[in-house]
């Protein structure tokens, strides 16, 4: 084998190795990427069987604990749309109605989001940027009232869908 052919052979092997490494890296990233969805996003474009993060506010009056003591059902809203969620496990101490929440899981066939992890905001002034952006896209208006913040739909006089965030 001549020197020129050997160089081309080595270059070809190097490119093949680099291509394989790139393909494996992209495949690993694709499996581990979890997209963020608001309730409105889930209604418009359901993710199928893909694992996603659902963010919004826990709707007032929606939290229900089941008899087994571990399963909890609640609704997540961005004031425009609402998605029912079920979670089996211990919820964070800061989890409560009217608070921001991010749940990671999958949409079930019955239209209920099955969460495998639930994250609550960590203090009274923090809201995950994704949740804040989703509320703004949904047209929610934040109103400050002494001791609490209220998110309501911008185009509605109906306060039935109002979500109240109580500050401790």
UniProtKB/Swiss-Prot annotation:
InterPro entries: CcmE, CcmE-like_sf, NA-bd_OB-fold. GO terms for cellular component: plasma membrane. It is found in: Cell inner membrane. Residues 1-7 are cytoplasmic. Keywords: Cell inner membrane, Cell membrane, Cytochrome c-type biogenesis, Heme, Iron, Membrane, Metal-binding, Signal-anchor, Transmembrane, Transmembrane helix. Residues 149-168 are annotated as: Disordered. NCBIfam families: PRK13254.1-1, PRK13254.1-3, PRK13254.1-5. Heme chaperone required for the biogenesis of c-type cytochromes. Transiently binds heme delivered by CcmC and transfers the heme to apo-cytochromes in a process facilitated by CcmF and CcmH. This is Cytochrome c-type biogenesis protein CcmE. It comes from Rhodospirillum centenum (strain ATCC 51521 / SW).
